[in-house]
Structure formats: structure tokens, C-alpha cells
UniProtKB/Swiss-Prot annotation:
Na(+) is not transported, but it plays an essential structural role and its presence is essential for fluoride channel function. The chain crosses the membrane at residues 5-25, 39-59, 70-90, 104-124. The keyword Repeat does not apply. GO terms for cellular component: plasma membrane. It catalyses: fluoride(in) = fluoride(out). Keywords: Cell membrane, Ion channel, Ion transport, Membrane, Metal-binding, Plasmid, Sodium, Transmembrane, Transmembrane helix, Transport. InterPro entries: FluC. Pfam families: CRCB. The keyword Cell membrane applies. It is found in: Cell membrane. One of its GO terms (biological process) is cellular detoxification of fluoride. This is Fluoride-specific ion channel FluC 2. Signal peptide: none annotated. It comes from Deinococcus geothermalis (strain DSM 11300 / CIP 105573 / AG-3a).
Amino acid sequence: MPFWFGVAVGGALGALARYGVSLLVAGRLASTAWGNFPLATLLVNVLGSFLLAFITTLALRGLVSPAWRLAVGTGFIGALTTFSTFAWESDLMVRDGEAARASLYVLGNLVLGYAAVLLGRALAARLGGGA
């Protein structure tokens, strides 16, 4: 099977997962103070950071094939996560006079995303037989 096919299938599944997360979060938060906070984007970006670190660490140890790494990393995780939406939503909050909320959102994406990378890498290293 060609690599591009795995990337395409992974991408389709990642896009559907992202859409599903946005529906779930919107339905649960609509009537709360967090209703207009872009929590779905934050969640998929943090989850994607964890998953990419996890799968890449396993791949670097030879525990995941290049085909799976591409299908999951480039395809699924690439479609699940979104830097462009994160940037756009940050700008919208600033333009709406919500600079503090935008700052929280930007810091949340960066700090939680990096923490998720550290956790994903550590978990994969542990499961893969190394530190």
C-alpha cells in the first residue's frame, strides 16, 4: 500500500475526529461561561501534541513502521490539530477586546501543548523499554 493512501485515510479520520470534538465541546459548553472560548481547538491541539510525541518516539525506537508514522502523524494528527484556527481565534479575541482571554488561550496552547509533548514522549519511552 502506498504511503500517500495511509496519509489520506488518516487525514480523513483526523478531520472527522476534530469535527466530532468541536460538536461535543460546543454542545457541552454552550450555556457556560466558557461557551465562547475556543476550547475544542485547544483540546485537539494538546491531544495532537501528545499523540505526535508518542508515535514519533515509538517510531524513532523502531517500534512503529514508517507507513504507520505517516498515516498517524502526518495524516490523522495533521488533520486533527490546527494552527491556523488557533491563530485566527486568537486574533478574533484580540479584535473583540478580549486580550486577556486571548493571552490565556495562546499560553494554554503553548504550555499545555509542550507539557503534552513531554508526557507523550515519556510514556512512549517507558512503553518502548527506555527512559
